[in-house]
């Protein structure tokens, strides 16, 4: 196997190993080479990556190698983390989020009755964005999951508590809850 391919496979192994990292002896076993050769390969990769000015580096922690971002780029990564999650949500996810916010705890079936369409994908998106979570189980057949909002939901939308959600007036009850929710959010951000 050529050195270039060994480096490529090592890079892939580092990626797959994630935060836990991978030990030189594990890489050696996979590549069917000596551990000393792995150490040389990693050193060559570190040197090459540094020379190319790449955003990732290989670090060794507790004898395991792992990929890490460069400290000098931390302000840029923080900007990504500070970006509001709502910007990346689909209209369906936003509508579902509004329903959960106002009607929690609520089951998926109840959400689907309100929206008139399936909400499974929207729910998965909201859970993955940590905006909603399972808060219990409803009584009845199948004991369906109950969903509610999270602290991240409050933080994302600048709310202290759920009581800060704009009240639904009787005249607005006919209006789409999602539209009401976002109109209210615009008022809060003024």
Swiss-Prot record:
GO cellular component assignments:
cytoplasm
Could you mention a single GO BP entry for this protein?
A: DNA replication
Recorded hits in InterPro entries, A to Z, give: ScpB_csome_segregation, WH-like_DNA-bd_sf, WH_DNA-bd_sf
- Coarse class of the primary localization is cytoplasm
Q: Which domain of life is it from?
A: Bacteria
Location of this chain's protein in the cell:
Cytoplasm
Keywords of the record, alphabetical order, are:
Cell cycle, Cell division, Chromosome partition, Cytoplasm
How it assembles, according to the record, is: Homodimer. Homodimerization may be required to stabilize the binding of ScpA to the Smc head domains. Component of a cohesin-like complex composed of ScpA, ScpB and the Smc homodimer, in which ScpA and ScpB bind to the head domain of Smc. The presence of the three proteins is required for the association of the complex with DNA.
The record's comment on protein family reads: Belongs to the ScpB family.
What this chain does, per the entry, is described as: Participates in chromosomal partition during cell division. May act via the formation of a condensin-like complex containing Smc and ScpA that pull DNA away from mid-cell into both cell halves.
Q: What is this protein called?
A: Segregation and condensation protein B
Q: Which organism is it from?
A: Bacillus cytotoxicus (strain DSM 22905 / CIP 110041 / 391-98 / NVH 391-98)
Gene from which this protein is expressed: scpB
